[in-house]
Amino acid sequence: MNATVVIDCSALVRALTDHGPAGFAVRDRLGGLDALAAPGLLDYEIVSALFGMVRGGKLTEREAVKGIADYQSLAITRHETLILWQRVRELHHNVSAYDAQYVALAEALGVPLVTSDARIQRSGAAKCSIEVFS
């Protein structure tokens, strides 16, 4: 098992809010790692996702606040990804520009990407290992 992974918003939201088997599986995968890495945009995506789940009735306000507090306690190394723009441009034909940031970072670091978005793996565009938890 690698000591570091890049984690995307979908997997992290699952880890923070899902009390079922999929959430447990992500938390289990992340346990014992030396480090988590992500593009700097993760902060914005997490807040947007959690508040969106409140608006959609999938989380209570209290659960969202707890999720943000739990997120803030995680040791995540945030990376600027503008330097990866050329790879992001290549990837954006197959995945969203947001997802391309995570893929390009995982490729640059030579570590797996942990996600709950199977479309990233199905795209076949990534040159890194993709671990899907859904």
Specify the residue positions occupied by each region the protein language model found:
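Short, well-structured N-terminal submotif of metal-dependent ribonuclease cores
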Residues: M1-L42, M53-R62, A118
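Active-site neighborhoods of divalent-metal-dependent phosphate/nucleic-acid chemistry enzymes
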Residues: L74-S116
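Acidic, PIN/NYN-like endoribonuclease modules and their adjacent C-terminal/linker elements
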Residues: M1-T4, L91, V103-S134
